[in-house]
Amino acid sequence: MKIKDETLGMWLGVLGVAFFAVTLPMTRLATGTQAAPQLSPWFLTLGRAALAGVLSAIFLLATRSPLPKRPQWKPLGMAVLGNAIGFPLLLAFALRVVSASHAAVITALLPLVTAACAAWVLHQRARLGFWLCAIAGSLLVVVFSLLRAGTHGGGFGLEWADVLLVCAVFAASLGYIYGAQVTPALGAERVICWVCVLALPVSLPGTLWLWPQQSVAASAWVGFVYVGVFSMWVGFFAWYRGLAMGGALRVSQTQLLQPFLSILAAVPLLGEPLDIVTLGFAAAVVATVVAGKKLSQPRHPAALATASR
């Protein structure tokens, strides 16, 4: 039975990572490009949070979940700013400019940045080797961005969309860290649900206010529903359940598949070509993440697993 649970947990982890990976091409499908815009980044951000918030409210009521205690509101509020607003908004603006494959390379730094932010916010000491991996991964992203800027005719320099993607990674990382502070008390699934519900007073009226007046392609609405239901909600249930059943240490390694799944998903969904340079840089960044995660683990195992999105 234990082996079956571990196997099921691993597959649930892979399923959760797959849901998160498809977020990038689906977001670009929803927002469109600068030449052919669809849903506005603001509407997409507030709309996906509102959709997930309604589903979360139903779940919390159905399970008779108690209200968070007073000390838990601040971490949940910070998670709202990072995960419900900051990350999706910055990502949506960036994906109007760059391809989903391009964004997959930049956001591959998320697990490494999360560990670095945890060391800073929680005042944890990290080994020198970890910081060297963080620097190496960051340099790879900078070089990739510079190369891509040149091929796009932007000359030698970073595109502003790359800055937005880096800021999105930091926003998500801080949101994960603050959410993790209340996870032991509330439970992982309830944390993401409370984050979505807390955003409702802003996300729901904002969605209605910003509802598009112009005609929008059906594919954009498909992207909207996907990021609201699967990226923002269902994916976390699969991911956290997988961590619980299969073991956080084993299942968390499946998130290393995320940038490659994003790149592969962008081929049929957006018609983006498979690029050897992009795949190569993604693999190199993932390698720094693997090394960094090993070096960030404490000498005496008592680690906290953080989900990536």
Predicted stretch roles:
Residues M10-G13, P71-V80, A126-S138, L186-V195, ...:
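Cytoplasmic-side transmembrane-helix entry/capping segments in multi-pass membrane proteins
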Residues G13, V17, L46-G47, A84, ...:
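Helix-helix packing/entry segments at the starts of transmembrane helices
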Residues M1-L46, V54, L89, H152-Q181, ...:
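Glycine-/small-residue-enriched transmembrane alpha-helix faces in small-molecule transporters
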